Amino acid sequence: LNAGIEANVEKIILTSSIVAMFKKPNRTNPYTFGESDWTDTDWSGSNDYTTSKTKAEQAAWELMESKGLKDKLTVINPGGVFGDALDKKTNTSTSYVELFLKGKYPMAPNFGILISDVKDVARAHVLSIKNPKVNGRRLIIGSEVKKMLEVSKIMAEAFPKYAKKLPKKEMPNFMVKLISYLDSSVKIMLPDLGILMQTDTSYSEDLLGMKFKPAK
């Protein structure tokens, strides 16, 4: 950021995440989050990943505001990013797809995820560069929130040969908690179990002049 400021660049686009927005205690259910919301990094339910994303974005806004350059910054906040991959490596989002297809989850954990198409995310970055409407804004990128069981059903339709391996029922929350004692990677799910996340991304579509691809 400092290098960009020193070079007097016209616009800075920062990639963040919705995890910088919705992690906080005492959430209602369903819980609606938006552009003005921030994750509480002091909350025990905020893990290293969500804390790092939140603090990095907050530091960016603080720096730009201190320089009087807030309007030169636009932040892109996608959800779970799915779609065409550049290589065979899986990221946090696509790892769920891989584990489902391999039959690692007999049942789907009870939580939802905002589905973001990777091409929509890329396009949002490009469109933001020359668009003054998004100056100083946080743009939530994604079409709709889907529960993991719904994701499994979509995958079964798209990949019939894997249908038998995919979860067909929702895993009780207590079972997920028990598994978390054996598998530390499951612990990050616990704070969001049973909470239906909701958000309205139409403002991002309007500002960018684009329509996000549906989850399916």
Feature locations, PLM:
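Glycine-rich Rossmann NAD(P)(H)-binding loop
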Residues: 83, 108-111, 139-146, 156, ...
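Mid/C-terminal beta-alpha module of Rossmann-like enzyme folds, strongest
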Residues: 124-188
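Glycine/proline-rich active-site loop of Rossmann-fold NAD(P)-dependent oxidoreductases
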Residues: 67-70, 83-96, 128-139
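A conserved pocket-lining segment of Rossmann-fold NAD(P)-dependent short-chain dehydrogenase/reductase
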Residues: 40-45, 88, 94-120
